[in-house]
Amino acid sequence: MNLHALCLLLLLLGSSTKAGEIIGGTECIPHSRPYMAYLEIVTSDNYLSACSGFLIRRNFVLTAAHCAGRSITVLLGAHNKTYKEDTWQKLEVEKQFIHPNYDKRLVLHDIMLLKLKEKAKLTLGVGTLPLSANFNFIPPGRMCRAVGWGRTNVNEPASDTLQEVKMRLQEPQSCKHFTSFQHKSQLCVGNPKKMQNVYKGDSGGPLLCAGIAQGIASYVHPNAKPPAVFTRISHYRPWINKILREN
C-alpha cells in the first residue's frame, strides 16, 4: 500500500474505532461553529464510517471525496454528537457529487459536494460558511484553524465534542515527502515542530483562515506528525459554482 493510501485510511474514521479530538487542539465553544456537519456514512461494503464536513448552502455540504459511501446522513447543529440537543437537524443526502478527476490512489482532487434531500433550517445553531474566492491563492505563513471530530492522538481515548486547532500554512517543500502533493490544488498545513494536527475522523472538515474556508482536510502521515494535506478550495471554485448552479 502506498503512503498516500495509508494516510487516507488514518484520517477516515472506521466502524472499529471511536471518534475523538483533533490532536493538540481545544474543545470549541458549543455551537460557535454552526456550519459544521458530522457525516454518518454507510460504505459500499456496508460498514459504518464517519467524516466531518461543512454547510455552504442550505442544501449543500462540502467535504472530502474519500468520504463517499453507499448512503450518508448529515448531522447539523451538534457539539457533542452523542448528546441530542434542540439544535440538531438530521438530513439525508440526496446526491453525492465527487470531483470527476478524483484519484483515490494518489489522493488528488479530494473534494465532494453533498446535496441534501431537504434544506437545512438556518438557526443560531446551524449556519453556512463562506468559501475562498475563485483563484484566491492563499500564501504560506498564514495562521488558520482546522475543525473536526477527529482523535486526540494515535492511541488516546475518544471524545465526542467538536475540536479546533491552530495550524500554520507551510511552504510546499514541507510536504515533499508526500510524493503526489500538488501546491496548486493542495495546501501544506501544520508546523512539523509542533504536535498540532488533524487526525482520524477529521476528514472533510474545513481549514478556516480569517473566517473563510480555504481548505478541506484530506490526509496526514500515519504517526500524526504535521504537516497535513488539505484540498485547496479556491482551485475548485469553478467546479463548485457549476454544481451549485446546475442543482
UniProtKB/Swiss-Prot annotation:
The active site is at H66, D110, S203. CDD domains: Tryp_SPc. Its EC number is 3.4.21.39. It is found in: Secreted; Cytoplasmic granule. Disulfide bonds join C51-C67, C144-C209, C175-C188. Keywords: Disulfide bond, Glycoprotein, Hydrolase, Protease, Secreted, Serine protease, Signal, Zymogen. Residues 22-245 form the Peptidase S1 domain. Belongs to the peptidase S1 family. Granzyme subfamily. Major secreted protease of mast cells with suspected roles in vasoactive peptide generation, extracellular matrix degradation, and regulation of gland secretion. This is Chymase.
